[in-house]
């Protein structure tokens, strides 16, 4: 077994986003764990390099022993701020800027939710926020639906990658529309990261 097969999602083809080469194609979050220790052990076992942090839901005070950030080594993991829970472009942009001011890098997983029940994205607001944040120097990874036209517009708006959902967040339904995801992948010139509902 080669070293690359030991790293989650690794292939022999480099995975590059906005000039940064990542050793793993798997990204994991920090939510829903019972304890910080469980979170750390799960992330470590995953082999992921990129860890998303929902800015609205965590303390950005790294000195707090009970905070998520106190348990994640930034020299080991690439911490990606996430605007999960934001329902307007203005709200998402506010939290992206807050994360950067608090010491995160300029990367952001941009989410603008349009429906509270399904957590499907508001693509019009997402496009607005993407255009503005990309203009401010953010590297935007946009959580979106599996629509090719929206993905193309996000590329034009300055996104560095799109993250089309496999199925609604938390549904565990897996990849519902492989044709749409495949079409997006073939048509876009930058990375496509399948996100949400992928199951376990």
Residue ranges and their predicted role:
Residues 2-29, 66-67:
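N-terminal amphipathic alpha-helix/helix-capping segment at the start of soluble metabolic enzymes
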Residues 50-57:
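A short beta-strand-loop structural module common to alpha/beta enzyme folds
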Residues 12-17, 32-50, 63-78, 86-200:
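Alpha/beta enzyme core
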Residues 29-30, 54:
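Short, well-ordered coil/turn residues at beta-beta hairpins
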Residues 59-61:
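Short secondary-structure junction/hinge motifs that connect adjacent elements
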């Amino acid at each position: 077994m080669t070293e690359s097969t030991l790293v989650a999602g690794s292939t022999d083809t480099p995975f590059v986003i906005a000039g940064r080469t990542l050793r793993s194609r798997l990204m994991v979050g920090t939510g829903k764990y019972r304890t910080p220790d469980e979170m750390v052990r799960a992330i470590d076992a995953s082999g992921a390099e990129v860890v998303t942090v929902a800015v609205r839901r965590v303390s950005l005070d790294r000195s707090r022993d009970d905070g998520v950030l106190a348990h994640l080594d930034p020299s080991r993991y690439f911490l990606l701020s996430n605007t999960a829970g934001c329902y307007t472009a203005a709200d998402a942009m506010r939290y992206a800027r807050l994360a950067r001011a608090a010491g995160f890098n300029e990367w952001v997983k941009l989410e603008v939710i349009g429906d509270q029940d399904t957590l499907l994205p508001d693509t019009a607001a997402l496009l607005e926020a993407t255009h503005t944040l990309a203009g401010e120097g953010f590297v935007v990874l946009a959580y979106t639906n599996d629509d090719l036209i929206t993905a193309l517009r996000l590329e034009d708006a300055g996104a560095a990658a799109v993250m089309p959902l496999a199925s609604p967040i938390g549904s565990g339904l897996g990849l519902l529309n492989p044709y749409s995801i495949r079409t997006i992948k073939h048509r876009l010139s930058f990375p496509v990261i399948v996100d949400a509902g992928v199951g376990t």
